[in-house]
């Protein structure tokens, strides 16, 4: 019997949703950073096994929005819960169930798919705290299963995969065996550049940046020539992004080029231009130009 279905991964910001997706896929498709609210779009990735096909939706973390971009991210995440076959609800070991987790649980009550509670980052906590957290969440919702894992250490993730197959319905193969994502290359390129910016900039700047791929061409030798605009909200942020003697921007570019060459499996030449677009996160038309379509 072949099983297939759509699986959405939800949770508060920075609980490891993208890390888990990348681990299960064996490919780096979702942007990963230690800063919260890193994922901005629903990334759809496809994992095909001998008798199953899983289509993952990696969502932004659900949080209280502060601007139109934040509204887009929360709408995107809550919409993804609807009409799926299985939900993975990720959280971390904690002393109490937070408001963000309770908000997600309220959204889960409006859908019929089974929900697996995944307690991530157990390698960073004590067994006592892990047990306490599982007990706390078991009182909040009737989960189909509850499982502690470490996505970073690949601990217990094989068992999680078995549980996911168990709860998938019988269904067709929606995508070819060799297809691993439905997003375009340009989107992944933009996400890689944004990830490197996140890792090389101070806490104040990263969430005020966006990446727009202006050009992506492959020459006769197979080399990619890529030009991107790195968009920020303030002139002062532009100086921080460029850095002294351009060193910060050079580091973003060099680390992005290395990752892009691994992803594209070809040589890459990348040029990054820093542009100021004041309050772009509250500019609906600009947000849509940058690919954030689900604004209400």
From Swiss-Prot:
Q: Where is this region: G3?
A: 58-61
**Positions of region (G4):** 120-123
Protein keywords: Cell membrane, Cytoplasm, GTP-binding, Membrane, Nucleotide-binding, Ribosome biogenesis, RNA-binding, rRNA-binding
Subcellular localization: Cytoplasm; Cell membrane
Family note? Belongs to the TRAFAC class TrmE-Era-EngA-EngB-Septin-like GTPase superfamily. Era GTPase family.
HAMAP family according to UniProt: GTPase_Era
State the protein's name.
GTPase Era
